[in-house]
């Protein structure tokens, strides 16, 4: 969010991109894309590299199944539409990173008739569950489609109290069609035995010249000096009592709060001084203890 806001503030189009779940390992990840030279390129947010399209997640991204971003307004572009609201449109940008295939799921009832308006969940195996990364509705032809990376994806379809499942296979690099039959009742348990294969590791080209690497090292050194100059203003055990300027039975606890507050120490000191002036320092300290370390220093 910070990097996107900073780039937009100086006129560079930027957006957050994320994979809802990795297909090859647990968890997810988010990063930043910028619009340069007529195309979107990525960077690792607050992880500066010498060039665009270089980040620690280049190989993981090559194994992704889905990548999403939000576009303000009533967007109408070539990407898959994941979700549309009055304020934004969520789209699938996996094609910017890897070779994709189009998965077409047709939903039928137990008698073989197509089902319109059925929910179709495209699921990625992650953290021991089939996570519904995208849920779409079938159209008038009983179909829902989605572009993904070349990996296995579990499909769950449901409508009118019935459901069915299927598997999109990794060995099909071309468009993949799957028919899911709603042949189970919502109250009915189902046992399945499946193997889930993530996309194979690929390569997202990332190269930087020696000059670019050297220039980036100089920038990092300069940025480190700015950060260290700022952190040197934080309160520590040596100057805490002097900065606090209060002689009370709660001084030790108050000093600890100043140290934990890091760059926010002035605001926390002001709060404690006002509390002390009103004979409420003990209560004020108890309230500060309820805050997480992150909250007190933000």
Where are these regions (language model features)?
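Hydrophobic/aromatic-rich core segments of domains that either
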Residues: 2-80
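Short Pro-Gly-centered beta-turn/loop motif in secreted/extracellular proteins
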Residues: 37, 140-162, 169-174, 265, ...
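Extracellular beta-sheet/turn segments enriched in Thr/Pro/Gly and aliphatic residues
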Residues: 82-96, 170-208
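A short, amphipathic beta-strand motif
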Residues: 101-112, 192
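Hydrophobic beta-strand segments
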Residues: 118-125
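Short, acidic Ser/Thr/Gly-rich low-complexity loop/linker segments typical of extracellular
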Residues: 126-148
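Compositionally biased low-complexity segments at domain edges in trafficked proteins
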Residues: 183-245, 249
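Substrate/cofactor-recognition hotspot
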Residues: 228-298
